[in-house]
Amino acid sequence: MADENETVVSAPVSTAAWIYVFPKEKELLDVLSVLSLMERNSPVVISPLLMNLTVENDFSTTVKTPITNFGGTILTKITSFMPVCFFFHGTEQLVGMAEDHGDLIRLCEQTRQKFHLQSFEVPTARKVIDIKALCSAVGKDADSVICHVACGNGFKELLFAGLLIPCVEEQIQVQVGEYSCVKIPLYSATLFETEETISLSSCTEFIQERGFFLPALSETLFYYVFTSWGTTLRFSNTKELIDAGLKQFTQDGEQTVKLAPHKTYLGISGQKISAVEKDFLMLVDSVVTELSFSHVAEYLDSVYDPSQIMNFNDWPIIRNSETHAERMAQLTNLKLHLSSHLAVLIFAPNSILYCSKLAFIPNVKQAFNSVMTQELLLRSLSFCNALSSLTEDVYNDNRKIIKCDSTSGKDDKFSANHLAYACATCPQLLSYVVWNLNRMSVYNAGNAYTEIYNHLVNCSANLCEFCDGKCCQSCIGTAMVRVGTRLPAIPKNVKKEPLVMSMFSRYYAEVDILGSFGRKPVSELKEIGKDQQNTLSLDRGKFVSQIFDYCKKNSLIDPVTGEDTFNVRSKKDFVSIIHGLTQCIEECVSRCIVEMRRTQTPREQIENCLQSFNVDTTPYATAFSPFLTFAYYKVILTVLQNLALIVASGHVVDRPCTGNSISKWLVQQYQSLYGTFHSSYLKKGFLNTRTVKVASNVDMEQILDCDLYKSGKYVKTTIQAKLCRLSMQCLRDFRIKNRPFNKSSKTAHNNPYFKKNVKHKKNPLSGCISFLLFKYHDKLFPNVKISCLELWQRFLLNNVPKTLDIGNPEEVKTFIKFAFSITNTYDEIDIIDIQPECLSTFIDCYFHNKFLSALGFHDYLTSLHGLTSKLVTQNPVLFPVVLDKQPKFSSIQEYLVYVKKLVLDGVPNPVIASLSKEPNFGTIFTSRSLVTFGLTLEKFVSLANREYFQFGQLGWIGGSGVDRNLNPTSSALQDFRFMRQKTIIATKFSEVIVKKVRRETIMFDTEVVKGKVLSIVENLTNDIDPELLIIAEVMRDREDKPTMDDMLFFVDGREALAASIMLKLNHLVDMNVRDFSIANLQSVFEAVSSNDAPVYDFSEILAEEDDQASGVLKCDETETETDEPMTKKNRL
């Protein structure tokens, strides 16, 4: 939504490109090596634009840059700097720190040939700038400095073409962090030459002699920026894309057609659609490409303030580090945390890196030969995975097919070429991705470990196609083998899927169970003082706050952190505390319902409630990572194309093309299209912008006299600087929403995924207080030496031997009866289907379950879940990157022995990022996190004015290799919970600086083990500790002890249970136990036998319900099991 009132801002008159000359200091190079994109054989390093690291503290991110000289007046344009800078000189030592991943440059070139992408060609007539002379001119020794260039978005084409003129006479001494540096301005060649002489293919003598042209820098820009933009826009002619951008900025060509005459249409020939539908698709494709390219420039050439994360010295991990070694360790940890998000973008087939194909997916309900309308066309268009179309024939501007000359044919499996394509064939980007792949978990699907071992043994033959046997321990070939089971499948059919993206979250979020329902609007709060009439809306939060006030008053929850603080001294104390809390919750629910009636709040408001959060769309939100900046540009371009579909579909249907040339038709229609699109998507529910007005459009400035400088004289003169555009729109955020109540169809109440069937759970360890029973087991039963899991198993079987000192039997009976009672009471009303892991979640779920059930809601809700990144250590045998040399092993055993020797010699276990369940979802946003999620941009027509609005629907993350937490537990359990859960993956920056689809046929070993662990606790056994059974199953095919992170996964995130099992497992390891059979485990722990011993009688409690429980963590349900296979369960 555009702001109602314009924000007045100011910006200095300054050039939009600077060369920075740094001293070549070891500590600076160390920091840059972690934060930058670099490749061992590429001299250019892509680094983040950060204050006190690469630019000075008071660096202006937005400037009015002089662009045209009219004699007595200089015309200026607003532009903001790119969030990255490019080190181009003195980088030999820096790139030498990069890990060797093989010949990535050759791989990228092969990829371009295979998928018909343009390669950079060095202009033979251009003179290369003399860097040594430039350094000497500012008093620096070229061999002792390292140089980078920071460039505005509008200047990137000028920088690529060598059309920027350095002015060493205006050098400035600046302090960047701890280093004294020199920066040199780069002025646009348009100030010195006429527009007619500014071109990519030719230049004047002045530009030839003075222009800042470096082929290596231009090549990096060609791939990192322009090829990336081209693949996102389905525009393969990268040179024409650069030329169009150059003319657009220097000649104000936003409202003219620039790309269409040179565009080819990829991914259309392979779609099984009619000729008419192909025509519609090509016309829409040309429109959205042109509109998006024009508008992305307008948004990026706008006013943006530096974000909070742009000041390197203010990062907590930097400020709190006392030594350089500590700083480097923290930065490396940050890089590993970010690998969680990179993994999603690489392994998800619906990632923003792949989904550039515009597909026509006909509506199955559409009648044959029916008249095409805007609504029908819009509903049929979707962006989807493009990997299967990269070698297809293409259509040209005249709608004639151009045969593909590729001999490779279609790929059935994801390869290194596809990975290079996703990285826009930029070696620096590809090297960064491979570094991360080498440090990601291996998902075993039966023989993955053996495949890795065999690969390493075969490396001794020096036949690797990527590194020729020079660095197989870290090369891309080994990385692809390691994560082979996790790589995305190449889709055979087009399908509508959400787009997976990584963005920086904003603080605002309404993500509790009922989201927007019962929230007091800000406008209403302002009106209270003006009008005291009793017409206020329901304030649901007031009643939830009353419960938390009760908890704080009774010392149950920490008032600051929200953590559990209550102390349980006995069973009676436990019953008293929980009973009092549930009574308080039920009273607040009653008051809330009374208030709902008093305010005449209809039940429909609950059904229509929305959960929502915002993500930052300013260019500097992800400035800390050049990889995320690369992905950010793809997100903005794709979203703009998606929004442009509304205008394009209506225009194409109303004004179809009757000639052969698409570009000629577009030239005729473009003024109308541009004007309609310019404001069509603002204030429409998804894309939020702000309107800014520059304070002064005319300034008297001391500026370089361009005419004299061209003749060899440096003179500054006072001249009038006039701004071309005074008011503009700036990107602010996206609004992402979710509907908790399923309203996807009229038969939603019959949907098996949301239908709540009658359950008869009798085991408290599967219910709402399980986290408390595990946590306080030692205090509830201080003299019992068996685990919580085994004790409650024996309670269920009425088989607790009297040799166990459980305390007063009558008190125990009362306690057990209460535990069963609250579990069954909660289960009867539970439609949220979230098992609490802390007291605050228990309160939230109990309150809303009680509230909704009292109002007659019975079906399950859609719930939001978070997975946050954490660092864990791993077994080094699956991480060949720990090797210090090229593998030369004759057998697998020799490799394993060598790695064990490395560990004994002190080589640390590799640290990688893993994902764990976030117990309190809302903290993801209050902690200002980087979030990765799926987005479906829905469009709907307003009945009032027939305008189209957008709904940014939170979607799922595709693929079975993204993370094991995202995959369903087991197809045999018939548990549809994963169909109702939407997940966001997050890294909380406050501490260190998330959908599900149907199961694929692949099943990883860890998931098999998890299914068996849960199966163990579903089947009653006598005299065997369930924890011992779990240990036996987990260790069945393992040689090494699982980590706590692994155990949490196996027991579905129950931390107390995992800790109890790990305690036993650590004891076994300390005793050097190798036999993990049940018999041996029982002998080690001297399991309590109850065959002959007398037992306590709890039969009267267990007989209160007719249906008997059949498990510990999950009991049998009475609903009819469906025979529908898991592969048929499509994500809603």
Curated annotation (Swiss-Prot):
Coiled-coil annotated spans: none
GO BP, one annotated term: DNA replication
GO cellular component, one term: host cell nucleus
Keyword Transferase: no
Region (Disordered): 1109-1132
Subunit text: Homooligomers. Forms double-helical filaments necessary for the formation of replication compartments within the host nucleus. Interacts with the origin-binding protein. Interacts with the helicase primase complex; this interaction stimulates primer synthesis activity of the helicase-primase complex. Interacts with the DNA polymerase. Interacts with the alkaline exonuclease; this interaction increases its nuclease processivity.
Official protein name in the record: Major DNA-binding protein
Lineage: Viruses, Duplodnaviria, Heunggongvirae, Peploviricota, Herviviricetes
